[in-house]
Amino acid sequence: MLFDLIGENNILMKHLKTIVFALLVVLVASNWSCADARVRNRVHRNNRPRMAAVVVGAERTGEYLKLLKGKRIALLSNQTGVVGAKHDKHTLDLMLEKGLNVTTIFSPEHGFRGKADAGEHVSSSVDEKTGIPIASLYEGKSRMPSKETMDRFDVIVTDIQDVGLRFYTYYITMVNMMDAAAAYDKEFVVFDRPNPNGMTVDGPILDMNLKSGVGWLPITTVHGMTMGEIALMTNGEGWLNSGKKVKLTVIPCKNYTHKTRYQLPVAPSPNLPNMLSIYLYPSTCYFEGTPVSLGRGTDWPFQVYGHPDMKGYNFSFTPKSRPGAKTPPQMDKLCHGVDLHNLKAEDVIAQGMNLEYVIDAYRNLNIGDKFFTSFFDKLAGRTYIREMIQAGKSASEIRAMWQDDVAKFKKQRRPYLLYPE
């Protein structure tokens, strides 16, 4: 009996050892497989292709130093002309470090430091850091420099961040300077920068009978082009007032396409403080031609809209005087309206130029023709937008009117594009 029990125990022990061994094999194999998977995943992540950083034209010194060496240079720029990984150096400083002879600075709307209100008079001055004279192009009625100023240099270099709208004035300043360069036989160079709205072409082509300081060329409202491309098209299409062509060189960006979602390192103007304001700008800027506040004097310019007499809204705001918006529309008045500043950027981009906001305010205020100022048609570039809103048409019906313009402009601009669409 005793020997039978011992025999049975030995058999059980053998089976137990076999089971334990099998479990150990499975456990080790499992751990090895997991470790191998972790290694594979780590290698995969490390090898994942990364989008190369955009290099702006000003940073590509090898492309322009030979062109500019030994010449007297006028730089048309503002606070957006920054370079470097940290965006903490101005193009002016880089040019001086490289031994280039910058004799004059031209400043556009908002001034060289970008602090002035829209359209505000900006006096000529001297750059405190370098001692180089700054000639303001927003000092008087004329946007053209004097002969005395033009005699100070041989070549004009432009480095300004645009946002891709027909009514955003930086491209107009550039085109005026191209006219001056052509008239005085000066070279013209553009250090190109990405267009944050470069993925979009929308709106009607400007009726040139409505040409103004917020609409200068026969282009769509949202043109989707960089400053360099606009310069090439202006030259190529014969759009300069003189009818002449300027000796033009564009230093293009690197690693950029028109589908690139480029984040601006510096606000292009005081009331476009973030990317959402830039994406909403094509839609909400029309309120500049109405009594409705678009948020100037608040933390959300171009990202809210309202009026003291608008009714039925839960959101309200009060515009206040502040730097960059000294006397905003409806200042110190409680405005009722719509908050757009929490919208997703992707949704705003997908909508394109959206007239629903203006139509909503027009119908809510119900003041008829008093809703529109003469400035509205200049912004719109066509009278039919105002007329169709007054006639009760929908945003989609109005949008259908400019689709032929969009197709025409896309075809016309194609030879001048520097970057893939």
Tell me what each language-model feature is.
Residues 123-153:
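Glycine-rich oxoanion-binding loops at beta->alpha junctions
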Residues 211-282:
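Conserved anion/nucleotide-ligand pocket segment
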Residues 113-119, 189-211:
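Glycine-rich, charge-decorated loop segments at or immediately adjacent to ligand/cofactor-binding or catalytic sites
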Residues 162-174:
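Glycine/threonine-rich flexible loop motifs
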Residues 1-48:
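Bacterial Sec-dependent N-terminal signal peptides
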Residues 103-110, 191:
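Short internal beta-strands
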Residues 254-331:
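Glycine-rich, aromatic-lined ligand/substrate-binding cores of catalytic
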Residues 301, 305-403, 421:
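Conserved functional hotspot residues or short segments at active or partner-binding sites
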